[in-house]
């Protein structure tokens, strides 16, 4: 296969991976952790994945502690955990 054909195949596979929805079984386990603002008192807008609604929702992060279900942007949340 030529290098052009390989690049095309790689591009198509990448596009497919980006567009394929994440199923519940494929989500990282931390996506199912409850929202946790942490123990500090900062006021940082963040997003978490809510498995009950299958949505990435906003919350206020305190700045320390919490858990891994904590994303700087809605797009990061959607890319990692899926959802709307």
Swiss-Prot record:
Its main location: secreted. Disulfide bonds join 31-81, 40-64, 56-77. The modification Pyrrolidone carboxylic acid is found at residue 25. Keywords: Disulfide bond, Protease inhibitor, Pyrrolidone carboxylic acid, Secreted, Serine protease inhibitor, Signal. Pfam families: Kunitz_BPTI. PROSITE patterns: BPTI_KUNITZ_1, BPTI_KUNITZ_2. One of its GO terms (molecular function) is serine-type endopeptidase inhibitor activity. InterPro entries: Kunitz_BPTI, Kunitz_BPTI_sf, Prtase_inh_Kunz-CS, TFPI/VKTCI-like. Residues 31-81 form the BPTI/Kunitz inhibitor domain. It is found in: Secreted. The record marks 41-42 as: Reactive bond for trypsin. GO terms for cellular component: extracellular space. The keyword Disulfide bond applies. Expressed by the venom gland. It comes from the Eukaryota. Residues 1-24 form the signal peptide. Belongs to the venom Kunitz-type family. Serine protease inhibitor. This is Kunitz-type serine protease inhibitor 4.
């Amino acid at each position: 296969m030529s290098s052009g054909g390989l690049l095309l195949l790689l591009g198509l596979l990448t596009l497919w991976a980006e567009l394929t929805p994440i199923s519940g079984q494929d989500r990282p386990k931390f996506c199912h952790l409850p929202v946790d603002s942490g123990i500090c008192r900062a006021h940082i807008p963040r997003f978490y994945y809510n498995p009950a609604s299958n949505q990435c929702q906003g919350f206020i992060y305190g700045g320390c502690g919490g858990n891994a279900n904590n994303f700087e942007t809605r797009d990061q949340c959607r890319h990692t955990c899926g959802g709307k």
